[in-house]
Amino acid sequence: MSSQNNNKQGGQDINNKKDSDDIKPSVSKEDLINSLKNDELNKNTTMDQNDMKKNENMNIKKNEVLNNSNNVEDGDNENSKFMNKSKEGLNNINGEKNDDNNSIVKVEESPKSIGYNYYASESIENLCKEFGLESINTGLNSEQVKINRDKYGENFIEKDEVVPVWLIFLSQYCSPVVLLLLVAAVASLALNEVVEGVAIISIVTLNACLATYMEKSSGDAIGKLAEMASPQCTVLRNGQKVVIPSREVVVGDVVLINTGDSISADLRLFDVIELKTNESLLTGESEDIKKTIVADNLSTPFATNLCFATTSVTSGSGKGIVISTGLDTQVGKIASQLKKSSKGSKLTPLQVALNKLGGLIGLIAIIVLVVIISLAVIIKYRDPAHADKDPTFVIIIIGVGFAVSSIPEGLPMVVTITLSAGAKDMVKKNANVRKLPAVETLGCCSVICSDKTGTLTEGKMTAINAVTICKNSSLSDENNKLTKTFDFYPTKGFEPCGGLFDSNELTSEKKKEIVIAKNQNTSYDKVLYNYGNPSNKSVIVDKTRSLMFAAYLNSYDTTLSRDPKTLKWGIHGNMSEGPIVVAAAKVGYSFINNPNHKSYLDNFQRLDDLEVTFNSSRKMKITFYKLKTVNVFENVYLDKPGKVYTHVALIKGAPDRLLDRSTHLLEETSMKKVQVSWNSTITQEERNVLIKKNLELSQKALRVLSICIKPLTDQNIEELKKLEDADERLKYVNYDENGGFIPMGYVASFDPPRPGVKEAIQTCREAQVKVIMITGDQKPTAVAIGKLIGLIEEKSEQVEDINSLAIECSELHINKNPNEPILPNDQLDEFTDKILIYSRAQPEDKITIVQSLKRKGYLVAMTGDGVNDAPALKAADIGVAMGINGTEVAKGASEMILIDDNFCTVVSAIDVGRTIFSNIQKFVCFLLGTNIGEIIYLSVAIVAQMPFPLEALQILFLNLMTDGCPAVALSREPPNDDNMKTPPRPKKQPIMTKRWWFYGILPHTIFEALCVLLSLAFSLYICTGFYNLNGIHNLCKTVNLVDVNDANVYHEYKYFCSSYEYRISTDYVGWVTNVSFWDPQNNEAVNFWGAAKGKVENINPLSDIVHPELRLRMQDGCSGDLTLDENGWCRPKDNKTSDGYNDELEGILKKGFEDVTAKGSKRGRTMAFISAVWCEMLRAYTVRSWEPFYKVFNRNMWMHLACSISATLTFLSTCIPGITSILNTTCLLWWQYLLAIFWALLNLFLDEIVPKVIYRRKYMTIKN
């Protein structure tokens, strides 16, 4: 609704109480003076105080006041209610008397009192003085232009600074999780672990690139506002007409505007010639606004004698004084609000939760790093796989590995991929997400504030009923003899095929038959008498067709046409007149049904210059036509003794307004013709019947328009031509010697709810998401729509029940006055906590409602389409702009755009948002559970003096490659059955709740650690014969050699190792002993696998149980500087010295040589690595639901693919040369792979039978 409705007052009951919206467009002298006197009203909430120049002791001329009050019709002084002022003492203000002459009334109060727009009410003469404008005919001089520019500023809206791409990219590295990963990467590179460091940096950089792209693609709302400004403007300067850039326009400039111009600044008009502007960008009102010199309504910020920056001139021309520029204009104030709401970070609940999680992970990483390194130093931990490396270096590498294991490297990437995939899902549901985190934010939305027209409804008004009004009618409604209700049918959007039938006769069966007749292109009369068929001759048809003809002629500038490509019917022109044009076509008034229609219409000459256009103050439109036949309009006879009616005024508008101005009725004569009942005027009883009928229709959610006629003589027309002002013509038509209006009937239209809206609202109710409807409609219509879509229960019939759920937005203001300040927060919050329907709403009311709801702790989604909706969209947690009817500014201020403008899309998006968060919980639980499990089994391995189950690079591989795919698959999980049957999560709820920690993460970490450690111990045992470091270290023999430079320094070298291995092959199953020794024949260190069957301690190379080939190699003993030890193995002699390097030293296992214990340990650890991978891979299956995993096993085929990829990558990492050396893995035998997987299956079994069973019993309802 237009902001011109700002004068709406108080609450409105459903009974016949006249809206205070009925304030007439003029203001009485008494009210204006009283408003100036009233100190309590010396504020202006509609326009900024800063926009009003304070001017005490201002003189107001009585004749100016009287000019304004001349337009007040009799009985229309309801502005007194608006001001709530007594009319006493008008001639004695501040002790100064006012006579009937043009004397001056001195008023000490500032004229900028609340309820009156200063720039609309102030005289042009005083505005000129205020701005230094000497003459409106010459404009400003150059010196005054400079003064005004310095004083009021330049005329531009400053765009937000464009954030460069590189800065957006760098900002992606500021999250705690990403910073931790960067620290781990730097540490890895510093320790020469290049592969690990590069891998981490690559993953983080890829994630930053994705996030940068999404953020950069979002629009700039303030920039869009600035782009709307006209590039140039025509002004008067120094007596000359010049064209200047709009930015150079200053306050006080005289601006000339013409058809097609975009207005550069806010103007006060002083000269207009049929000037109309379109202000829909600001007000949301699609109607062109006819501009006047004298304002229709002084209380609205969008008075008709003002023009506004960024609006366009649709017809006519005019001149005006610039009253505001730049950020002081109406559109500038919107830009200021946008800037204000943009200040500071607007983190979504997910971003907050991820930051908290990152902080927790960082704390864990630091603690783990310090504790593990300290513990490893204390116990002098030495990894057998790196026995030849510096122990301190190994310990630091281990610490970094632990820190890496505590950080879920894949988390940022998976979150980004999840949100991106969710955004794509929403596009499929007609929701375009502009800001990626908003995808998930919808999941915790607890309130949806929705527009009605086009969002909850289809936005396609369709005429449903025609009601004729006629005395002595041969066919009338059952409950009265004055009206008769007819139904248009079928009613399918703008399709003009259909007829007009008696409502009492149009049963469900008849409707089906009519549809069949329509499809077969046969006459409806064969089914039911069509009162809209021109071929049917009856007095009732005369009445219905005359009613629709009058309505059609009044809507002359709206046309109906069919797209030749899509074959869809559409309306061109005023959409609010569309239903009338379509309905008229159904009774034969269209080019479609009547080829000669144009020539027929040409018989009715329209008098364009006399038209009274519709605005929100008049609530009516009047067109004037010359009659084809005097005293006859269509089938209505206007004869009156002594009068010759040559013209007719056709009036269409609000029923209450038109009924107030009606004096006579039509009647049906005994001769079965329709004529005006001039002999009697409308009685109160007859008025009550018409009022009741209007109310009956409006309570069915129908928009009711009254159609009236007023016959005029040639003399009337001549007198009307002398009146330049439309309101004067309205007054004349209403109160001339011919009487007032003659009502012909009502046309009731219905904007049907969108399919699925009622079900969507019920879904929201089940999901405990509050739905609020905000509309410009009157309260009864809004309530009726609310009932129709299920927003209010049908049983809510009592006024007190409805008032507890629906209010007019004026009630949000002090004294129920929309021009006074908003109620205090505590009182306001009481309203917004329970109200579901806000009627008579203005765009500025939306931001008030949003702010109140946010104070109450709700997470608010707000829909909007206009420029003036942008601040509310920005203030809401989730701004939702309309894709079809939305302005670019609204889209730029929003997080999401509804491609189809459909409310159901918002609900679908909430469903997707909840699913996304649920899936984020699942993969965060999955990643944290596996990572903490890694910390536990790595820590226990150190304490238990066992080799590490995994190395640092294996951990990174596990976290990124094998965990990454299942985590992404978890993000594609379908919603749970109760997804939209649970309340929205609180905004401050962490990602991982206590339940997730106690039943999801901690049990799994314990079970995974247990299974991996069991796998490590068992694997080491079957590969080396021992499971701990001491046992493995004792398998090797060493020699201590004196340093060549210092006799007190010794260097320790291994010269022999043995280990045990359990084999399963076709020819042997059992233990074997493997040895590493110095081969004297080849003069090198070698490994001999299967040196002897069984576990042989202190093995001798010449023993009979030793493999013959080994005996052959050692049969000649050692030579040179080597000697045999007690078991017959070569070693350096005791007198041998060393410089600490063993590259040239014989008889030892040189640096870099991988002996049987190292190889056995690697094999055992590879098996543990396989177990860890499969533990985490199978965990992805168990974390999907609290139900047993087999029940949801096949609901997400992506999971099977992801786990197949992870399993394949893991297998390849143990078999492909090069990769195995990087990851320090080795290829296993088939049964060793199976044994490793067995421990993972044990982990799955424990996850299923312990925590999930307990959780289901405690929290889940058992379904019968």
From Swiss-Prot:
The keyword Ion transport applies. Changing residue 398 to F: Decreases sensitivity to spiroindolones and aminopyrazole GNF-Pf4492, increases resting cytosolic Na(+) concentration and sensitivity to the growth-inhibitory effects of supraphysiological extracellular Na(+) concentrations, decreases the rate of efflux of Na(+) following an imposed Na(+) load. Changing residue 203 to L: Found in parasites grown in the presence of aminopyrazole compound GNF-Pf4492. Residues 15-42, 50-64 have a biased composition (Basic and acidic residues). Pfam families: Cation_ATPase, Cation_ATPase_C, Cation_ATPase_N, E1-E2_ATPase, Hydrolase. Residues 1-12 have a biased composition (Polar residues). One of its GO terms (biological process) is sodium ion transport. It comes from the Eukaryota. Inhibited by cipargamin and other spiroindolone compounds. Inhibited by 4-cyano-3-methylisoquinoline derivatives MB14 and MB10 but not RK18. Inhibited by (+)-SJ733, a dihydroisoquinolone compound. Changing residue 172 to K: Increases resting cytosolic Na(+) concentration. Changing residue 350 to H: Found in parasites grown in the presence of dihydroisoquinolone compounds; reduces parasite fitness and increases resting cytosolic Na(+) concentration. Changing residue 990 to R: Found in parasites grown in the presence of spiroindolone compounds or aminopyrazole compound GNF-Pf4492; confers resistance to spiroindolones; decreases sensitivity to cipargaminnd and (+)-SJ733, slightly increases sensitivity to dihydroartemisinin, decreases affinity for Na(+), increases resting cytosolic Na(+) concentration. It is found in: Cell membrane. Residues 1-102 are annotated as: Disordered. Changing residue 966 to T: Found in parasites grown in the presence of dihydroisoquinolone compounds; reduces parasite fitness; no significant effect on resting cytosolic Na(+) concentration. It catalyses: Na(+)(in) + ATP + H2O = Na(+)(out) + ADP + phosphate + H(+). SUPFAM superfamilies: Calcium ATPase, transduction domain A (SSF81653), Calcium ATPase, transmembrane domain M (SSF81665), HAD-like (SSF56784), Metal cation-transporting ATPase, ATP-binding domain N (SSF81660). GO terms for molecular function: ATP binding; ATP hydrolysis activity; P-type potassium transmembrane transporter activity; P-type sodium transporter activity. Changing residue 184 to S: Found in parasites grown in the presence of spiroindolone compounds. One of its GO terms (cellular component) is plasma membrane. Keywords: ATP-binding, Cell membrane, Hydrolase, Ion transport, Membrane, Nucleotide-binding, Sodium, Sodium transport, Translocase, Transmembrane, Transmembrane helix, Transport. ATP4 inhibitors cause swelling and partial lysis of infected erythrocytes, probably due to the osmotic swelling of the intracellular parasites because of Na(+) accumulation in the parasite cells. PANTHER family: P-TYPE ATPASE, SODIUM/POTASSIUM-TRANSPORTING ATPASE SUBUNIT ALPHA. Sodium-exporting ATPase. Required for the extrusion of Na(+) from the intraerythrocytic parasites to maintain a low cytosolic concentration of Na(+). Belongs to the cation transport ATPase (P-type) (TC 3.A.3) family. This is P-type sodium-transporting ATPase4. It comes from Plasmodium falciparum (isolate 3D7). The gene is ATP4.
